[in-house]
């Protein structure tokens, strides 16, 4: 009985591993039609009795402002070009902070955020964290850094029902994603930790201050020239 159950479990895990590898490989080239987060937000709106229409237009890498690319890295993951999906020192610092009884603080890299937004549900559990680590490793293994950032910029949430750089640029500033200024890019990056609560186009004092910090970090990183560090040597 137990051996039969273990065999079935092993087969299920093998099928899951093979299927997830196949999906991640396909998405290396094919634009994702949607994300788990988008589905979650849509279902939530139905249950709340306020159905929303999702705004999202896939925009290729070359049609997204370099200012936004650097702003997101500056605000969310300054070690993006050098790590392999996990910022261990940041994770250790977050764990120590949380153990001291402070407000729970995360340390997710951009790759981890892509894994979560694309494939997983919201919430905190060891199962979800384990799956997040699995998908993060696969994404780092099979995708280039440019592809990871491209998918992130097309799947990030920037308002109620607003997903991706193009929809965010149109919704908040009335321009295409390719025409975002440095200030606009910094304001969009500033609201990423809480895109429903905060507004990029009508920034609170805190968001404005955070956007200013992001602009300074962008300059320290070297501006758009920083993107050259997302080197092609990581590609298979």
From Swiss-Prot:
The alphabetical list of record keywords is: Cell inner membrane, Cell membrane, Cell shape, Cell wall biogenesis/degradation, Glycosyltransferase, Membrane, Peptidoglycan synthesis, Transferase, Transmembrane, Transmembrane helix
Q: Where is the chain membrane-spanning?
A: 12-31
Q: Which reaction does it catalyse?
A: [GlcNAc-(1->4)-Mur2Ac(oyl-L-Ala-gamma-D-Glu-L-Lys-D-Ala-D-Ala)](n)-di-trans,octa-cis-undecaprenyl diphosphate + beta-D-GlcNAc-(1->4)-Mur2Ac(oyl-L-Ala-gamma-D-Glu-L-Lys-D-Ala-D-Ala)-di-trans,octa-cis-undecaprenyl diphosphate = [GlcNAc-(1->4)-Mur2Ac(oyl-L-Ala-gamma-D-Glu-L-Lys-D-Ala-D-Ala)](n+1)-di-trans,octa-cis-undecaprenyl diphosphate + di-trans,octa-cis-undecaprenyl diphosphate + H(+)
Q: Which Gene Ontology molecular-function terms are recorded? A: pentosyltransferase activity; peptidoglycan glycosyltransferase activity
Q: Which GO terms describe its cellular component?
A: peptidoglycan-based cell wall; plasma membrane
Any one Pfam family match given in the protein's UniProt record, by short name: Transgly
Domain of life from the UniProt record: Bacteria
Q: What is its EC number?
A: 2.4.99.28
Q: Is Transferase found in the keyword set? A: yes
Q: What metabolic or biological pathway is this protein involved in?
A: Cell wall biogenesis; peptidoglycan biosynthesis
Q: How does it sit in the membrane?
A: Single-pass membrane protein
Q: Which terms does the UniProt entry file under GO BP?
A: cell wall organization; peptidoglycan biosynthetic process; regulation of cell shape
Recorded hits in InterPro entries, A to Z, give: Glyco_trans_51, Lysozyme-like_dom_sf, PBP_transglycosylase, Pep_trsgly
> Where does this polypeptide localize?
Cell inner membrane
Q: What is its main location?
A: membrane
Q: Which SUPFAM superfamilies match?
A: Lysozyme-like
Record function comment: Peptidoglycan polymerase that catalyzes glycan chain elongation from lipid-linked precursors.
Family the UniProt entry places it in = Belongs to the glycosyltransferase 51 family.
Q: What is this protein called?
A: Biosynthetic peptidoglycan transglycosylase
Q: Upper taxonomic classification of the species?
A: Bacteria, Pseudomonadati, Pseudomonadota, Gammaproteobacteria, Pseudomonadales
């Amino acid at each position: 009985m137990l051996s039969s159950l273990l065999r079935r479990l092993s087969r299920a895990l093998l099928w899951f591993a093979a299927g997830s590898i196949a999906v991640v490989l396909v998405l290396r080239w094919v634009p994702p039609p949607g994300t788990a987060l988008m589905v979650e937000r849509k279902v939530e709106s139905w249950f709340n009795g306020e159905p929303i229409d999702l705004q999202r237009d896939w925009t290729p890498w070359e049609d997204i402002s370099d200012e936004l690319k650097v702003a997101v890295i500056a605000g969310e993951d300054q070690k993006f070009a050098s790590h392999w999906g996990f910022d261990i020192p940041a994770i250790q610092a977050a764990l120590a902070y949380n153990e001291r009884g402070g407000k729970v603080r995360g340390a997710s890299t951009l790759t981890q955020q892509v894994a979560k937004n694309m494939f997983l549900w919201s919430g905190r559990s060891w199962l979800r964290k384990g799956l997040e680590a699995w998908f993060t490793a696969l994404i780092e293994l099979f995708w280039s850094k440019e592809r990871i950032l491209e998918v992130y910029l097309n799947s990030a949430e920037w308002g109620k029902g607003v997903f991706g750089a193009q929809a965010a640029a149109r919704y908040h500033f009335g321009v295409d994603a390719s025409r975002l200024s440095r200030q606009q890019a910094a304001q969009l990056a500033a609201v990423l930790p809480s895109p429903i609560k905060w507004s990029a186009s009508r920034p609170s004092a805190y968001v404005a201050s955070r956007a200013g910090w992001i602009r300074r970090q962008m300059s320290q990183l070297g501006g758009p020239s920083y993107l050259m560090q997302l080197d092609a040597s990581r590609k298979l």
